[in-house]
UniProtKB/Swiss-Prot annotation:
Acidic residues: bias regions: 32-41
Role of this protein: RNA-binding protein that mediates pre-mRNA alternative splicing regulation.
Phosphoserine found at: S27, S33, S249, S255, S256, S458
Stated name of the protein: Nuclear speckle splicing regulatory protein 1
GO cellular component: nuclear speck; nucleus; ribonucleoprotein complex
UniProt source species: Bos taurus (Bovine)
Compartment(s): Nucleus; Nucleus speckle
Region (Necessary for alternative splicing activity): 107-171
UniProt cross-link Glycyl lysine isopeptide (Lys-Gly) (interchain with G-Cter in SUMO2), position: K211, K282
Gene responsible for this protein: NSRP1
Segments forming a coiled coil: 105-179, 379-428
Annotated spans, Disordered: 22-57, 195-534
UniProt entry keywords in alphabetical sequence: Coiled coil, Isopeptide bond, mRNA processing, mRNA splicing, Nucleus, Phosphoprotein, RNA-binding, Ubl conjugation
Length: 559
């Protein structure tokens, strides 16, 4: 069943009933007169007026209802203006554009003023020089000075005085221009005497001090009316610092806002504690200035010893004076400890950051090296797969090259060992005392061999050997004569350069003779004698040494 009151299908809106009835057009063939037309037009205008009045009443009623609910319904302009103001306040760019001040123009204006003053000074100097050049030509004339010029001169004098004071103050305040600690001690002395105001302490510490005094129940307790409120204390410290800017110039400057707040607190605390100090110092200073200082001192000691109550009062005063100093020391130590903690924390953070960054860099480099290594291996494998024969050939060439290098290194090592061995043998023979005896023995052995070979050789070779023997005998005679002349000098490493040169020449000659003998003598002749064998080895070493000494250049040793 269909639910009653519910429609289904296409729902079309019903046309609203027309307020004004539709007037039928008069027919063309009707008998309507002009009077009927007038009546219809009047009725239509009346109906329209009535509809307008009804709509006006309705709108007035609605306006009254809306105003009763909210009085600011129709204040469009004011609400829009407020919205625009809020937008402008929330937008910092617009605020910066409005309140923006010139950045550089004031500095430029100052520079212009300074240049003007310098120009005026230059002109005055120029006029002064011209007057000096005139040499009193116009001294009898009257000099007229205007009031404006007098005013300018006065302003210039005042400005010069200001500059001089500013320079002196800067020199006093500048730490780099201080020659000694006289300024620091001067401030301390003035503060102790009372000529300068001591920097005030903080209100918080003053309040804690008042609480401690209340708990102890001192008789000289400060009344609530005489207590300094924090705003007045802060104002007072600001005024005092402005009046005496040099009073606290040698102390440390606070680097952060917290330290500045703590400094203000310490100043307020110091003011309260040192008021009693200044009064006490004045009390002790005044009797010293008076003529009857000794009598007053005696009177003071009598008054001091009159009653135990006054003694207790003075003790409390001393404690009260010492307490600010102790608290000030504790404040400074706390501040230093806080600074150290802050610095250590910063250092720890920076070291942790550096270590983290280093670790990250190492991991990145390691990863990059691994990637490059993997890429190289992958390329190598691809090349092997593509060109296996080429890879084998390259491997074979590399092995041959390595083997050749190893052989070359072995040869170089052997040649070096030989040279070292030759040098060692030469030094040993030069240092030994039996060097010349052994040479004589070698010469005798060689002569015996030569005689033996001469029998076998041809007559031409015999003539040559005879000539060589004569030369050898003459040289031996010369050597014996030298030995007889210098019998005390042994043949050691300290022999003269001439003797060394002679020995090298003999070695060269012996080498030449050996070559000649080898040409003549049969190479395959047996030598069973041990002396002949040792002499041959010695001859070989002598030949090597002769070659080394004959070289005019130094061979480069291969690495």
């Amino acid at each position: 069943m269909a639910i009653p009151g519910r429609q289904y299908g296409l729902i079309l809106p019903k046309k609203a009933q027309q307020l004004h009835p539709v007037l039928q057009k008069p027919s063309v063939f009707g008998n309507d007169s002009d009077d009927d037309d007038d009546e219809t037009s009047v009725s239509e205008s009346l109906q329209r007026e009535a509809a307008k009045k009804q709509a006006m009443k309705q709108t007035k009623l609605e306006i009254q209802k809306a105003l009763a609910e909210d009085s600011t319904v129709y204040e469009y302009d004011s609400i829009y203006d407020e919205m625009q103001k809020k937008k402008e306040e929330s937008n910092p760019k617009l605020l910066l554009g409005k309140d923006r001040k010139p950045k550089y123009i004031h500095n430029l204006l100052k520079a212009v003023e300074i240049r003007k003053k310098e120009q005026e000074k230059r002109m005055e100097k120029k006029i002064q020089r011209e007057r000096e050049m005139e040499k009193g030509e116009f001294d009898d004339k009257e000099a007229f000075v205007t009031s404006a010029y007098k005013k300018k001169l006065q302003e210039r004098a005042e400005e010069e005085e200001r500059e001089r004071r500013a320079a002196a103050l800067e020199a006093r305040l500048d730490v780099t221009k201080q020659r000694d600690l006289s300024g620091f001690y001067r401030h301390l002395l003035n503060q102790a005497v009372g000529e300068e105001e001591v920097p005030t302490c903080s209100f918080r510490e003053a309040r804690s001090e008042i609480k401690e005094e209340k708990s102890k129940g001192y008789s000289d307790e400060v009344s609530s009316e005489s207590r300094i409120p924090p705003e007045n204390c802060i104002r007072q410290t600001g005024v005092k610092v402005e009046e005496n800017p040099d009073a606290d110039s040698d102390f440390d400057a606070k680097s952060s806002e917290n330290d500045e707040m703590e400094g203000d607190k310490g100043n307020c605390r110091r003011e309260k504690g040192t008021e009693t100090l200044s009064s006490h110092s004045k009390h002790h200073r005044n009797p010293a200035r008076s003529p009857s200082s000794s009598e007053e001192r005696e009177h003071g000691t009598q008054c001091h010893t009159k009653s135990s109550r006054s003694r207790g009062h003075e003790k409390r005063e001393d404690e009260h004076q010492e307490r600010p100093a102790r608290e000030q020391d504790s404040y400074h130590t706390d501040r230093d400890s806080r600074k150290e903690k802050r610095d250590s924390h910063r250092h720890r953070e920076s070291s942790h950051r550096d270590s983290h960054w280093k670790r990250h860099e190492e991991e990145r480099l390691r990863g990059r090296d691994e990637r490059e290594r993997n890429d190289r291996e992958w390329k190598r494998e691809k090349d092997r797969e593509k060109y296996p024969s080429r890879e084998q050939e390259r491997h074979r060439q590399r092995n041959n090259y390595d083997r050749h290098n190893e052989k070359g290194c072995e040869k170089e090592e052997k040649s070096k060992e030989k040279e070292e061995h030759v040098k060692a043998r030469k030094e040993r023979y030069e240092n030994s005392d039996k060097y010349r005896d052994r040479e004589k023995r070698e010469v005798s052995v060689e002569s015996s061999e030569r005689n033996r070979d001469r029998k076998e050789s041809s007559p031409n070779s015999r003539a040559k050997d005879r000539f060589v023997n004569q030369e050898r005998a003459s040289k031996m005679r010369d050597m014996e004569k030298d030995k007889e002349r210098n019998p005390e000098k042994p043949s050691s490493s300290e022999a003269s350069l001439g003797a060394k040169h002679r020995i090298t020449e003999e070695c060269q000659e012996t080498g030449k003779e050996q070559e000649r003998l080898h040409e003549t003598v049969n190479k395959f002749a047996k030598r069973s004698n041990e002396e002949t064998v040792t002499s041959a080895r010695d001859r070989y070493l002598a030949r090597q040494m002769a070659r080394i000494n004959a070289k005019t250049y130094i061979e480069k040793e291969d690495d």
